Amino acid sequence: MGKFDRYAFSAQPSFDEAATRKAFSKAIPLKTLVIYCYDPRAAEIPNAVAKLFGDEVFPGDIILDGSGNRVASTTTIFPVIVAGGRAVDALRSITVAQHLFGIQNIVVVHHSHCGATSFTADGIINAYEHEHRVDISKLYDRSNICISDYEASLKHDTALVRSHGGTPKNVNVFGYFYDIDTGTLTEVVRDVRRA
């Protein structure tokens, strides 16, 4: 038995995967997954999405049981924070969120003055090889490495999300540009499959 097994649901003798999954879906009412950049200036993006959508809760409250254990939350937004807010790095999280919670919306947000706009695909590949003596040119699809055109990158990322096998066909997919100075979200892509 591992040192931390008591914290893993699947390591418990009484583990029932179907029952655990059902409990997860009731404990946290997540319905919207928001993919955005790890730039600290972009930290307000989930709040902006919650405000824009109107029926979302973020960050919400943690619910404690009688023993003081953290057993649930009131948040409806699941943040996925990755470099440049690029969707390629969030695909597995989309599949897991759907499996555990049954999501309704996926929102991809790219923000103004993002560090991912400060280099090109060739630039980072060449610099990495020069500085670390490693060729990363085959590790990543060039269209997912940087942002040179916000509208094009949002259209690319939302299409990537929509076409991915781990994305439920009935979820809504949105792409927004976020101005970090004004806090304004501008819709670039709307692919609505459910009301």
Predicted regions and their residues:
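Short, ordered loop/turn segments at secondary-structure junctions
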Residues: 111-113
